[in-house]
Design a protein with these regions (language model features):
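Secretory targeting signals
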Residues: 51-73, 116-185
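Long, hydrophobic alpha-helical segments
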Residues: 71-91
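Helix-loop-helix units of permease transmembrane domains in multi-pass membrane transporters
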Residues: 91-117
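Transmembrane alpha-helical segments in integral membrane proteins
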Residues: 86-97, 166-189, 239-250
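Alpha-helical transmembrane segments of multipass membrane proteins
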Residues: 43, 47-51, 119-127, 171, ...
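Central hydrophobic cores of alpha-helical transmembrane segments
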Residues: 190-200
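Selective transmembrane-helix segments that form parts of the transport pathway or gating/packing helices
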Residues: 34-44, 109-132
Length: 255
């Protein structure tokens, strides 16, 4: 009778490359594409078709000799708000899972950043393509403007892309920072956070009013233009992203 001796192989202690760890977090965040992709596109499509149908009915009721201005609809703005919600849900739900699967806090923050950039670029490109079709068809044949505004109607496509990209990144960073506060300090942290935010907003508006600086603010916005003013949002985006990292690096997954 012979016996077989089994020798256990030592476990590899070589750490995974950073890119691999980041990709793992990104795959985790995209695990349910309905949340970040399918649902917002479905809602956007339904809202667009409803607006187009309503505007077509209104236009059909105008006499042939009547005039009708191009309608500008803000329905597409819901997409930016929805991405803020996606950011909040992603951080709240995926952060403890990522740590449970062996990812570090840095891996999660970097992975979330890649996740946000991918969605921001993708949705910005979609809005640009839709706006180009909208222009080419004269507002979908009925003078209806859903994917663009009067300010961007004459702008170059890359300006619309840059503006959308900046807006998406801003909303993602705000959502991540807000969610990180809840992850670390729960309800009490949210009370303090929103209280401080309201206080800062009212205080800032009061300061500008006391200095009679509103005309200067308006002049600056007019001078910078839509895209130039939006570029300043990068400061807020960077601050929120940094805040999310500083908060999450000390956060735990326990209640």
């Amino acid at each position: 009778m012979t016996t077989t001796t089994m020798t256990a192989e030592p476990l590899s202690t070589t750490p995974r490359p950073l890119t691999t760890r980041i990709a793992t977090v990104v795959r985790l965040l995209f695990a349910n594409p309905w949340t970040a992709i399918y649902t917002p596109l479905l809602i956007l499509g339904v809202v667009f078709l409803m607006n187009l149908a309503i505007w077509s009915i209104v236009r059909a009721s105008i006499p042939d000799d009547g005039e009708m201005a191009t309608a500008v609809n803000g329905g597409v703005l819901f997409l930016f708000i929805y991405m803020l919600v996606v950011a909040v849900q992603s951080v709240n739900q995926a952060f403890p899972l990522a740590l449970g699967y062996g990812s570090t806090r840095r891996d999660f923050v970097l992975g979330f950043g890649v996740f946000a950039v991918i969605l921001s670029v993708g949705y910005s490109a979609m809005l640009v393509v839709a706006s180009l079709i909208e222009r080419a068809t004269g507002g979908w044949g009925v003078g209806h403007s859903f994917f663009t505004t009067d300010e961007l109607w004459q702008a170059e496509w890359w300006e619309g892309f840059a503006l959308s990209l900046l807006a998406f990144l801003l909303f993602f960073s705000i959502g991540a920072a807000t969610a990180s506060v809840y992850v670390r300090w729960k309800a009490m942290g949210m009370y303090v956070f929103w209280g401080a935010l309201v206080f800062a907003g009212i205080g800032g508006a009061a300061l500008v009013t006391m200095l009679n600086a509103w005309p200067q603010v308006g002049e600056f916005l007019a001078w910078a233009g839509v895209l130039g003013a939006a570029a300043w949002s990068l400061i807020i985006t960077a601050v929120c992203a940094l805040a999310a990292w500083l908060i999450l690096r000390r956060a735990t997954t326990s209640g």
